[in-house]
Structures are given as structure tokens and as C-alpha cells.
Amino acid sequence: MSWFSGLLVPKVDERKTAWGERNGQKRSRRRGTRAGGFCTPRYMSCLRDAEPPSPTPAGPPRCPWQDDAFIRRGGPGKGKELGLRAVALGFEDTEVTTTAGGTAEVAPDAVPRSGRSCWRRLVQVFQSKQFRSAKLERLYQRYFFQMNQSSLTLLMAVLVLLTAVLLAFHAAPARPQPAYVALLACAAALFVGLMVVCNRHSFRQDSMWVVSYVVLGILAAVQVGGALAADPRSPSAGLWCPVFFVYIAYTLLPIRMRAAVLSGLGLSTLHLILAWQLNRGDAFLWKQLGANVLLFLCTNVIGICTHYPAEVSQRQAFQETRGYIQARLHLQHENRQQERLLLSVLPQHVAMEMKEDINTKKEDMMFHKIYIQKHDNVSILFADIEGFTSLASQCTAQELVMTLNELFARFDKLAAENHCLRIKILGDCYYCVSGLPEARADHAHCCVEMGVDMIEAISLVREVTGVNVNMRVGIHSGRVHCGVLGLRKWQFDVWSNDVTLANHMEAGGRAGRIHITRATLQYLNGDYEVEPGRGGERNAYLKEQHIETFLILGASQKRKEEKAMLAKLQRTRANSMEGLMPRWVPDRAFSRTKDSKAFRQMGIDDSSKDNRGTQDALNPEDEVDEFLSRAIDARSIDQLRKDHVRRFLLTFQREDLEKKYSRKVDPRFGAYVACALLVFCFICFIQLLIFPHSTLMLGIYASIFLLLLITVLICAVYSCGSLFPKALQRLSRSIVRSRAHSTAVGIFSVLLVFTSAIANMFTCNHTPIRSCAARMLNLTPADITACHLQQLNYSLGLDAPLCEGTMPTCSFPEYFIGNMLLSLLASSVFLHISSIGKLAMIFVLGLIYLVLLLLGPPATIFDNYDLLLGVHGLASSNETFDGLDCPAAGRVALKYMTPVILLVFALALYLHAQQVESTARLDFLWKLQATGEKEEMEELQAYNRRLLHNILPKDVAAHFLARERRNDELYYQSCECVAVMFASIANFSEFYVELEANNEGVECLRLLNEIIADFDEIISEERFRQLEKIKTIGSTYMAASGLNASTYDQVGRSHITALADYAMRLMEQMKHINEHSFNNFQMKIGLNMGPVVAGVIGARKPQYDIWGNTVNVSSRMDSTGVPDRIQVTTDLYQVLAAKGYQLECRGVVKVKGKGEMTTYFLNGGPSS
């Protein structure tokens, strides 16, 4: 019966579930482990003891265009996951289980259910729904508190009206009972008082529960008083009143399911007990009690069918909203991490410009955009570690990366203190610029002080390691172009002839000395003592360019005094701040080094900076709940309605929102129709029990039953469509998925139930008893009273009619009203029908019923009942009256009570419909806003990751983003067989000139950008997926293959052949570029293979690189190569020759640091 479970089961779309556990599969091993043994990444801390690994939060669903290896990383780990805790919702499509960590998981219900399981699920329907987390349950109650408060206030007004109606019904006849009048007056006063209480600002959730139970107590008292005050008494007297009380207990009082069920059953039982005790001598007691039981059971069923889906929908909406907020916060947290990492690698102005270009779709241009800015009056410092090869040969991979990381992290700190911007780390070479991005007048002083500090730092390394290492520092002042080139693996860099000169100043310098040009000396203003540097004697370039150089001897006396005073001020500040700020450590978190203003400009709201420490201390669940709590406090229901929803119609003011809302599918629609069928069955049983049978009545009931059953079956196809023909599936989908069609079917079902409630009225005897008795007693019909009928020995319920006729007598028309009320209550089950639609339907049905009741033939049934009920009262009193002194009727005529009863029920039904629709629409609106914010965060995350993946390899970026708790860890890999390529444009330096005609060299860089972009596009091709671009160094392009398990082919060595193919492809591309740019660029490419160390150094500004003898030799293959040729080592020759590649021996070549080596030229790929 899967179609019926639609009522009991909250359908959850797997693609957008609010349960955090559905969308990800648990990873079988931690990030960083490899199946093979060639390359094992290690993460170590040089500053702290080892800590347990922090879990990676599960990512939310993402757009298809974000689908890449990094985004698809695993699911939730164990620990503090960002998953919603399960809520006990009774019947569901999924089993809710609890893991060892206490987190709820949801498993698909694919196993057939046993009878015991179905019974257990059925019992859960009647249980109160609540989240397993008490805090989450409190948030849910607060979430709906404002709506419940306004609904409770309106309910008090309806109950005041109800007490007024009851008072009028009781006081209108001649014999009102003071006790009952006093009871109703007190009840009305209490309801007014409670209405005032509900509107007070101090009204809280706990008070709402108290008010609800007080209302139930008052209703029970009114019900008892009404039964005792009934005159004449009857088991069906005032039957509509407990039906109304039971209905509002389920629908309008903000109480949980268990309390609603107990209240409904309690009120029903109370009326049955009173009817039994007060009418023991009634000949028709058990017949009417049986009908009453069916009537109350049906009312309770309607209440359950209304309360359960409404609460489940509300809780599901709350879950989904919380889920979107949770995903948004998670994405915001990830974006903040990405922004910090991004801004730690690229200057803010460059990163923002790139992000803006990604956000804005540009028209296709002839050239790729170049991100370059020109800066005059800067100083460039190049520093190289002399003796690094000796140091590296004595270190393991871990020790090498740790040493470099600590040393360059120290340099980064010194650069920040000396107002220098680190540009790049090239192996053991470090270079920075002062005067970027903001201009400084003392840029030369900053670089000189930076050089002094670097030499002091390397002396400490020399003392600790015992290895003779030192620094050569070269400085030049002039103009630079700064920015990034290419499409992938962006690295901020500087270019100009002055940068080239600064590089040669380092190469022509002396160990432990600072080598400067005259241009730099002029900016120093005599603050330093210098001596001739004679750089031309040590460097050919300096000699060719006739560069006059100097070596710094030390600061002048004036400069020493200024530095001493500055140091004293800094010590004073340090002493005053001691204990407030942490001491410097070499590898502090990059994620905490940037100003929040940059994050806001990049699209991340960092307004919570002041509370950052508190939020970092919260676990993810508590952070989501805290955010949701603040959002609930800030949310104004009245303002939301005013801004977005029309007051009476409850439709959205914006048509696009209304269209989106109308496309919402209610998967429980089949259950609503099934519930209407159940109400119809109860009505049939009541009428068969109370009223005489007729062939016409049975025929009508059979026809309605078939129509409703067919409707239910058609709607059920939507839940289990694969078992039915496709035409029937399409019909079912067209009904359930269309709000207009489902509304029409819902109204049709209610009309059928309504027809069953009134159809039997036309099969009863409509002859007025007054007319028959008047003929028998020779009186006018107006003179006939109950006493006259008593004299004729005719009373209520006699089968033999007083008047001649062929149609049966219907003695208890109160049950027609009861059935009519049930048919109206059945409309409340269809939660998807709009409140204005329900109001129109109730108005039309009520009008039809009143026209029949007041003007149609059935009116005589109610007149006859009022007269016979008086006879029944006289018989119960055992008194005899003649026709002249017969007592007046003790109650208002039933047909005049009916319009007022219908009005009270219509108000309650409309109030409930307004509450349901208003809640659904506001939930939809808030969820839509949360969804929009989440999607914006997803887009921002995608932009950030596209930028980030163009800077660091994906697994490296994953390390820095996922392991935020261990920001001081190192990342490195020892890889045993990696192919490395250096490809340089040998004559680009001849092409590069700085003239006004080419914008001081920018146009030359633009062409270089196009060349590198072409190389990047080629490396992005699928056949070169094993390759990883490392970086560009001026006009040299560096790439490698086999750096991780996914790209390393230990057996087939395909990663090596892929790099060889790429090198040949670059040669072809350079020929193509020369043809179209009318240039004659010549490329030299060097290839080598062997073990390398890959890792990241400088956690403040992480930079990925590879080191080792393999890298050095590959670079030498490029520098000692021949233009337009690809030079490879003997090791690589053996692999390529075995694969059929065409190579020729070049011979013996002298290689710096390696002596003589036999090399080969790669001429072509395998012959076909």
C-alpha cells in the first residue's frame, strides 16, 4: 500500500535532502593515503606534537559544472559532521539509524516490510514528533512560534463566538438554566483573557502549551455543561459541539500529536459517557451511541490525517531550511578558507580582477587577457643560497622540505617586517620587491635591511647544520611589470630589464655580502657605507652592460642611531604586548594572515570577525543552530507577509514566486484522496446504522465508492508507477504534479463525500407530521404540539409512519448534519488546496445544504424531528399534558441552528486553511532565500576553486583546505620516478625591449602570455592528463609527470612518454606561433627522469615546487641544449628508445655540477 504511505511518509528528494548524510559516501581511507607504494605524502609539524586528524566536513550538493576531482572528495568523516540529526517522524521512506558516533544516518527502505514493522510504523503516527536534539527541537518550536501565536489568538476569537452561539441557543427558549449560562459566560471571559495573554510581548513557548491545555479544559467543561443542560436530553443532543472541539484539538491548538490524540479521544469518550449515563432509559440509546462512536472515530481520523501531514511538512520544511543554512555556512567557511589561501598566494588586486573576470562572461577576444601592472621606483632583491646542493645531499626529503620551509618562512616574516613582497621561490633562490603593491620612498632601504637580515638568518643555519651555506644578495632599483601569465598554475611574478639586472647582480655577487647597483645606491641617500663591487669581473652580463656595482659595508652612524632608536621602541611595544600576542613560529597558519576587508571585497562576509574565536570553538552543528537562532529572532512574520504575500488571497506578489510555488509537488496527494474515501465509508456506516435502507441509497453509495476508489488508484500509480501501464502513469503524473489538476481532483472528491452525506435526505418520507395529526384530530397544523402526538401514542423512532407514504421515516436528522460536517472537515485533509479555494468550496457546499434544508423537501424531516423530540422529552419525564397546556420546546429548532453551526465550522476550517497555507508559503519563501544564498555561495566557491586550482595542484589545495586544524603541517611527497621538462624560449630576451611604442615592454609580455596560454591549453588536453604544470620562470615553462598515484604508471611508463609527446607538441606549436606572429622564436627543451621531492613551502604564502637532482639535471638539459631541439638524458633515452621513439646521440656535454654527460636528441615519436 505504498500509495497510502504518502500520507504517512514525508517524501524526500535525494538530490536536495536536508539530511547531511545522504549525499556523500564515507571514504574508505583518509586523504593522502595511496594504494601503491611509490609516493606517500606525509604531513608533519616541526612545531607541535602530533594531533589526531581533523575530519573533512561533507560537502553539499554541487552543480555539474563544478564536478572535478577536488570537489568530489569523499563524504562525511566521523566526528563533527555537518549532518542534520534525525527526527522521529513516524512512517517514513527511510529507516533512521544511529551510528557509533551518535549521528543519525538514513538508509533506503528497500526491504519488504513485515507486519510487525508496519504496525510499529502505524503506532509511530500517533506519537509526538520531535527532533533527537533538544536544542534543535527548541529551535523548531521558536521557528513556528509567531505563526502559532497569531493562530492561537484567532482561535480564541472563534471560541468567544462559539460560546456566544451556545449561550444564544440555550437562552433563546423559555427555560434557560442559570448554571449553564454562568458557565458559558465564564468560558467566554476566559477566552477573552487568554486572547489578551497571547498578544503580550512576554508570551513564550511554554506559555503556549499552558494556554492550549487550559483551552482543552474549558472545552471539556462546556461540553459537560451542555450535556447536563440539554432539554430534552438525547444521545445526539449537541453532537456537533464535541465534533468541533475534537477537530480544533487536532488542527488549531499548537499541541503535539500524542496530546491531540488523547484530547480528541478524551472529548469523544466524555460525550459518549455522558450520553450513556443521561439517557439510560432511551429505547434508541445503543443505536445512537453506535453512530456517535463512528462519528467521533471519523472526526479523530480526519484530525490525524490533517495534523500528521501538516506537522511532518512543517518539520520537513524546517529541516530543509536548516539544511540549506547549514550548507551555506559550510560553503561560507570553505570559501573563507579558499579566499585566505588565494589571497596568501596572489596579491589582492590581482585576485579580485581575476575573480571579476570569471564572474563576468567576456566576449571572445583575439588575445587572452593579461593581468599585468607597471610600477616605477621599486627595488628588486635576489638572494641565492650558496652551498645548497651540499645541504640537500645530507638531508632526507622530509628534512629538506622542513629546512626550506622554516628558512623561507623566516624570510617571509623578514620580508613583511621590512615591507617587501615576496615574489617567488625558485629552488634555493628567493626574490622579493619593495614598493609593491603600494609605493614607498624608502624601498631601497627596505631591500638592504632585508638582505642584512637574510644573511644573519642563513648564518644561524650554518651554525646549526655545520654545512658551509651562505647567501648571495643582489639588489637593483628601477621599474617592473608585475602580474601573472598563462591560464594555469598562476604565480605572481615580475618582469623587466631591471629584474634581469637584479638577477645578474645576485649571480655576480659575493657570499655573505649585499651587492647593489648605482641606481640603488642613489636611493640610499648615503645611509650606508659601500665599497666597489666589481661585479663585471664575476658576471659577463654585468660586464657587457657596463654596470657599476657596490658592496654594502655597513650602515652609517646616523643610520645606526635611527635603527637603535627603532629597536628600542619595538622592544617597549613587545614588552607591553607580551602575553597578548603569540610568539612567531616559522610556519604559522596562512589562513589567519589576511585582513577581513579583503575577504569582504572578494565576496565573503567576514562581519563576524569579532566573534571568530567563539565560532571557531563551536562545533559545526552548534554553529548552524546558533546562526538559525539569530535568523529566527530577526525574522518578522508580519513583515514577510507584507513584503511578499497578498493579504487575503495569500498569493505571492511576484508572479515568478507564485509559479515556483505552484510547481511544488505534494507526494501525499494520493493519501488525501484515500482519507476522503475513508470519511465516505464512515458516513455510509453511520447512515446504514441510523437510517432505513433503500435501494436508491445503496446504489448511490456504491457509485460514489467506485468513483473514489478509482481516483485513489489513479493517484496511487504516482507512487508505484512501474507496476501500471504507461498511459495510466502519465495520467497519474499529470494529476499529482499539477497543482490545478490535483486541486480539481481534491474538490471532486470532497463533492462526492458531500453527496453521500446529503443523498439519503431525498430517500426519506417528507410528509409533515403536523398535517397528518391535524387531519386525525380535526385541528389546523399550526395548533399541533408534542402533547397532541403523545395523545396519538406516536413518538420518536417508530417504524410505522403516522402518515401514509411509500418512503421510510428518517427519525434522527441530526446525523445528516453530522455527516455534512464530516464532509466539510474532509476538505481540510487536502492541504495543498488554497485557503481561498477551500473557503469558496465550503461556501458553495454550505449554501446548497442550507437551500435544501430551509427551502427544499428535506426541510420537513427536521420539522418532524423537532416535534417528535418534544414528544420524546415528555415521555422521558413521565408526565402527561393535554394539548392546551403543553410546555414550550426547550431548544432552538434544528434547521435554524444549522446555519449558525455551519458558520462556526466554516470559520474554523478557513482559519486552519489560512494557517496551513500561510505557513507553507512563508516556509517556501524562507527556504527559497536560503537556497539562493547557498547557490550564491556555491558559485563563489566554484570561482574560488577555479582560481585556486590554477595556483596549486588539486591534492595540494585539498590538503590546505581540508586540514585547517593543522595549519603548521608540511606537505611533501617522495616520488621515485618523475619525468621533468624545462622548455625555454632561447631568444626571448632579444625580443624583449622596453620602448614607449610597446608600452615599456608590456606588448612583449602580451605575446609571451599568448605563448604560455597556448602551452597551458595543450597541457589541459585529455591525452596529457598525467602532466602537471609546475611554474613558469620568465620565458621558461616547467612541467612534470607522475607526481601522484593517479598519474604515475610504474609498469607502462606512460607518464614519461606523455611528457615526451608534450615536448614535441610544444615544438610544433612554437612553429605555428612563429608563422602567425612573424617571429623567429627558438625553443630549447630539456627532459630528465628520476626521483624528486614535491611539496609546499611557505605556509604564509604556500608555493608548490619540486626539488632534487632530477630537477637540476633537467634544467641543465635545457640550458645546455640546442635551439629547436629536445635534449634528454641517458635514463630517459633508454625508456623512450624501448617505446620506439626516434632519438639520436648528441655526444658528451659538460654539465655544471655533474661533469660530462652523454645526452640525446628526441627527433620524433614511435614510427607507425
Curated annotation (Swiss-Prot):
Cofactor(s) listed: Mg(2+); Mn(2+)
Post-translational modification comment from the UniProt entry: Phosphorylation by RAF1 increases enzyme activity. Phosphorylation by PKA at Ser-662 inhibits the GNAS-mediated increase in catalytic activity. Phosphorylation by PKC at Ser-556, Ser-662 and Thr-919 inhibits catalytic activity.
Localization per record: Cell membrane; Cell projection, Cilium; Cell projection, Stereocilium
Pfam families: AC_N, Adcy_cons_dom, Guanylate_cyc
Top-level taxon in the UniProt lineage: Eukaryota
Modified residues (Phosphothreonine): T919
Extracellular side: 760-819
Keyword line: ATP-binding, cAMP biosynthesis, Cell membrane, Cell projection, Cilium, Disease variant, Glycoprotein, Lyase, Magnesium, Manganese, Membrane, Metal-binding, Nucleotide-binding, Phosphoprotein, Repeat, Transmembrane, Transmembrane helix
Annotated function: Catalyzes the formation of the signaling molecule cAMP downstream of G protein-coupled receptors. Functions in signaling cascades downstream of beta-adrenergic receptors in the heart and in vascular smooth muscle cells. Functions in signaling cascades downstream of the vasopressin receptor in the kidney and has a role in renal water reabsorption. Functions in signaling cascades downstream of PTH1R and plays a role in regulating renal phosphate excretion.
Protein known as: Adenylate cyclase type 6
Gene from which the chain derives: ADCY6
